[in-house]
Amino acid sequence: MQSCRVQCALTLLSLALAINSISAAPTDPRLRQFLQKSLASAGKQELAKYFLAELLSEPSQTDNEALESDDLPRGAEQDEVRLELERSANSSPALAPRERKAGCKNFFWKTFTSC
């Protein structure tokens, strides 16, 4: 019984030392700097999308009379603003799909394809 306790204590002590030595291992500062830069650029874009999603999910404030319009019904205006925000969040100039008219033809590698 005594040897089992001693063996368990030694095992836990060795595991604690192994974990401590792994976490205290030196890291390359260039690698850390590269990872921070890449995460910062991706993080800003993800953070902006997150905040935009939060804004879209919040119910509109009916207390604010400055935003109310007499021209459009309240629901239609909210839908229009929401669609515009979603389009601006999801669109990027390099990846925006081309809008084509119905029935147009596209010449691709010696053949015509419909759009």
UniProtKB/Swiss-Prot annotation:
A GO biological-process term: regulation of cell migration
Cysteine-cysteine disulfides: 104-115
Transmembrane segments: none
Listed GO CC annotations: extracellular space
Pfam families: Somatostatin (PF03002)
Signal peptide: 1-24
Location of region: Disordered: 60-79
InterPro entries per UniProt: Somatostatin, Somatostatin/Cortistatin_C
Annotated compartments: Secreted
Keywords annotated in UniProt: Cleavage on pair of basic residues, Disulfide bond, Hormone, Secreted, Signal
Keyword Secreted: yes
Maturation propeptide residues: 25-99
UniProt family annotation: Belongs to the somatostatin family.
Protein name: Somatostatin-1
Organism of origin: Pelophylax ridibundus (Marsh frog)
Name of the gene encoding the protein in the UniProt record: sst1
